[in-house]
Amino acid sequence: MTEQFNKKIIGDCTLYNADCEEVMPLISSVDAVVTDPPYGMRFVSNYRKEKYKEIENDNGFKFLKWATTIKAKHSTYVFCRWDNLYQVIKPNSLITWVKNNWSMGDLNHEHARQTEVCLFYKGKNHFFPKKRPTDVIFCNRTNNNYHPTEKPLQLISSIVEWTNGVVFDPFMGSGTTGVACAKLGKKFIGVELDPNYFQIACQRIEKAYQEPDLFVSPPTEIKQEVMEL
């Protein structure tokens, strides 16, 4: 049976509304991966379940193991929960995000968490384009609420700045990684299964190119295609 999915090109960003496992064979290679895969938690918190619907394909941390095997030539950055650290391939280092404006978080856990972790895997061609960065990032939580596990643009931009070449996010969500790439003048490939979040991502990335404070040119044309597998 032939399956179809949407492909949209906005500037240097190529976006797919599809399952990442279907798109991966179509991508020859990437330089870097920056992603926040499903946590296997069904909802963002037990405190306000009614605010968000369930996350598509949020069915366990097999996705994290898969994401770390992507052949990124430069680097791979994967956000994860602390209790999933022992289920994954050993990273080269661990980056800690300290939330300046932390909250009570998931009430099922003993402590209110002020931090989240990001795993770093070094590719064979890895180097830092600027000075060697620290392994701690201090950044406020986002107030946008486009997605239940959305990361702040400042946080993702800090990590994207450490990459070179084409950046890939197989779990794009509401498109924060793509927005960061648009702002920083980097090429981006993103995949999102949920059509609603995909549309939000497209709108945010298009807007990022149009904002006057950016040093990259706006896209001359937005292309949309329907691809068959």
Residue ranges and their predicted role:
Residues 214, 228-229:
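Replication-associated primase and helicase/ATPase modules
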Residues 17-22, 218-227:
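Conserved SAM/SAH-binding loop
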Residues 57, 204-205, 221-228:
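Short amphipathic alpha-helical patches
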Residues 2-3, 8-10, 202-217:
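Short, conserved SAM-binding/catalytic segment
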Residues 4-189, 194-199:
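Core catalytic lobe of class I
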